[in-house]
């Protein structure tokens, strides 16, 4: 069995004296792992940083085997290591993907969205909202998407203010009535009437990541890297006023 193409590094794990087990994300394969002989060397360390783009050839005798990678650099993203926020961002993205996705299950749209987000993080400008919409894409790709386009009760597209914590559907302020305290607020950033910032929008996606995604994985908690990113983005917003 053989596959070749480009992918972005998601994770690596030391294996033996000098090898690593590399996990990458590509449009064609989804997440795929392979052994990289000599991958633990200082020479290859920079190339195999999470978020970097690499050119790969994967080979295995049988499809179900781990296989080995021959790896060459394709495009580095040095900006991911250039700031604490960007580093926290790539750590959250790679941790969520390796937590959520089964191996060798292609999600081309999610892979494209991930590449675009990593490019924004590398450039270092205005990627917080893009990260929020990336989480929405992740939920959608895994079958847990939110429907924030119309009210679940009346069908109205105006005056949306809440989200049902169970169905993930929007609810208008008028339709919510006495149930409003039991619903989640829908921030303006996601088309609602709320005034909250990025932390409120991420609290909404975080609820569904935990309830739907984590519980689908035997109740395992979400990777701590996400909480660290949310804390940094919240602090940055309060410091800068965005």
From Swiss-Prot:
Pfam families: RecO_C (PF02565), RecO_N (PF11967). GO terms for biological process: DNA recombination; double-strand break repair. InterPro entries: ARFGAP/RecO, DNA_rep/recomb_RecO_N, NA-bd_OB-fold, RecO, RecO_C. Keywords: DNA damage, DNA recombination, DNA repair. Involved in DNA repair and RecF pathway recombination. PANTHER family: DNA REPAIR PROTEIN RECO (PTHR33991:SF1). This is DNA repair protein RecO.
């Amino acid at each position: 069995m053989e596959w070749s193409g480009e992918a972005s590094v998601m994770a690596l794990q030391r294996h033996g004296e000098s090898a690593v087990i590399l996990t990458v994300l590509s449009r064609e394969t989804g997440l795929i792992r392979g052994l990289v002989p000599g991958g633990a060397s200082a020479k290859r360390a920079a190339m195999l940083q999470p978020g970097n783009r690499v050119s790969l050839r994967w080979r295995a005798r049988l499809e179900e085997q781990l296989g080995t990678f021959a790896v060459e650099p394709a495009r580095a993203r040095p900006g991911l290591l250039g700031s604490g926020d960007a580093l926290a961002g790539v750590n959250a993205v790679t941790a969520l993907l390796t937590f959520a996705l089964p191996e060798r299950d292609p999600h081309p749209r999610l892979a494209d969205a991930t590449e675009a987000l990593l490019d924004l993080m590398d450039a270092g400008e205005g990627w917080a909202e893009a990260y929020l919409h990336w989480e929405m894409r992740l939920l959608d790709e895994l079958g847990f998407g939110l429907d924030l386009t119309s009210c679940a009760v009346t069908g109205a597209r105006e005056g949306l203010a809440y989200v049902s914590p169970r169905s993930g559907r929007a609810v208008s302020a008028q339709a919510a009535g006495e149930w409003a305290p039991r619903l989640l607020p829908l921030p303006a950033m996601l088309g609602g009437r709320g005034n909250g910032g990025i932390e409120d929008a991420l609290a909404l996606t975080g609820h569904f990541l935990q309830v739907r995604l984590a519980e689908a994985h035997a109740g395992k908690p979400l990777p701590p890297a996400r909480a660290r990113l949310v804390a940094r983005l919240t602090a940055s917003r309060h410091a800068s006023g965005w």
